[in-house]
Amino acid sequence: MYHPRELYPSLGAGYRLGPAQPGADSSFPPALAEGYRYPELDTPKLDCFLSGMEAAPRTLAAHPPLPLLPPAMGTEPAPSAPEALHSLPGVSLSLENRELWKEFSSVGTEMIITKAGRRMFPACRVSVTGLDPEARYLFLLDVIPVDGARYRWQGRRWEPSGKAEPRLPDRVYIHPDSPATGAHWMRQPVSFHRVKLTNSTLDPHGHLILHSMHKYQPRIHLVRAAQLCSQHWGGMASFRFPETTFISVTAYQNPQITQLKIAANPFAKGFRENGRNCKRERDARVKRKLRGPEPAATEAYGSGDTPGGPCDSTLGGDIRESDPEQAPAPGEATAAPAPLCGGPSAEAYLLHPAAFHGAPSHLPTRSPSFPEAPDSGRSAPYSAAFLELPHGSGGSGYPAAPPAVPFAPHFLQGGPFPLPYTAPGGYLDVGSKPMY
């Protein structure tokens, strides 16, 4: 038998089986040690063999102090060790789009969070100086809560409305260029525009999980390491900018923020005054849908007195949106763009195949001298005129008469095949849709 002091000498004098010494640890006074006394146990049966052990009641002593660790990603650093936030001397970080962030911060920045994830705007765009050009660094970003309050929009400003919800699992976004040399990071600004925010706690894509109606602060970390999963860290620096504080929402609450986002975000140009998603354009599209199809739109099919050439008679108002101010009244009939050939072309059918299913009956039909083709295994919902082959082609094995009207040679027996592809499964540029 061995005494624990002999087996574990590295534990130090703090781990003892005897009574704690009053002066051993000032943070653990003897009065508190009484509360941690073990319950009275039966007399050990091996006391005769361990006569040297102390018979005093066994108490718990204080644990030895733990060494200081670097701050974990996604957690607040310890205020007693501010030097741990910047262990890369000479490295500085500046916010490139500071003026844009200040403009949003003066109103109260809001960031949309969705289940699928939504990108931040404005995005964090920084420039770094003072790095070792030959060393490798990692750029990381995380988002931490600013305080322990939940906020609510009160018509003109945000006000605290209660205690914050429990903190969600912390996640860190790693810049896709990491790890890279210091010369690479200092060559141009570093953008975190791909960061996405979500409110789904079960998100499998690695997006940053946030609570709605809470105030958050992005942090940018710069870590010196040779590899992405390296265990040998050469230093770390964390940076925060007061202008980047925002409140996470599922829908914009402040109308001024909505206008700023539309004016500054290049991807929101459709919501501007003359954009496709402005109120005027949306109302015009609704009116066109309620008006229904124009009666003159189908009369252009099969007009045989038009000159030959490329035909695109199916491109109506649903594809090319016209100016709502020039839209015709419900009682007026607008003349559809006249085709330049005798019948619809292959491009027209590929764009709108459903438009030919109800084509009028006066379309040109198969020539009587053209015999019925053998069953090709699939039905042809369009007119038989589209199945005719040019004169002299040996596609069907029957003597073919000249077609009644000219048409583009895009259709073979049994249905359309994309050219120059010779087998089903090819893709066309029109809509990028597979034919089969």
Swiss-Prot record:
Composition bias, Basic and acidic residues: 271-284
Domain of life: Eukaryota
Subcellular location(s) of the protein: Nucleus
Result after altering R150C: In congenital scoliosis; uncertain significance; not change transcriptional activity
Recorded GO CC terms: chromatin; nucleus
Effect of P145L: In SCDO5; uncertain significance
Annotated region (Disordered), positions in chain: 271-339, 360-379
Keywords associated with the record: Developmental protein, DNA-binding, Dwarfism, Nucleus, Transcription, Transcription regulation
Gene3D superfamilies tied to this protein: Transcription factor, T-box (2.60.40.820)
One Gene Ontology term from the biological process aspect of the record: regulation of transcription by RNA polymerase II
Segments of the chain annotated as binding DNA: 100-273
Biased composition (Low complexity): 325-339
Keyword Nucleotidyltransferase: no
Disulfide partners: none
Summary of the tissues where the protein is detected: Expressed in fetal tail bud, posterior spinal tissue, intervertebral disk and testis. Also expressed in adult testis, kidney, lung, muscle and thymus.
Subunit-structure text: Forms a dimeric complex with DNA (in vitro).
Function noted in UniProt: T-box transcription factor that plays an essential role in the determination of the fate of axial stem cells: neural vs mesodermal. Acts in part by down-regulating, a specific enhancer (N1) of SOX2, to inhibit neural development. Seems to play also an essential role in left/right axis determination and acts through effects on Notch signaling around the node as well as through an effect on the morphology and motility of the nodal cilia.
Disorder cited: Spondylocostal dysostosis 5: A rare condition of variable severity characterized by vertebral and costal anomalies. The main feature include dwarfism, vertebral fusion, hemivertebrae, posterior rib fusion, reduced rib number, and other rib malformations. SCDO5 inheritance can be autosomal dominant or recessive.
UniProt protein name: T-box transcription factor TBX6
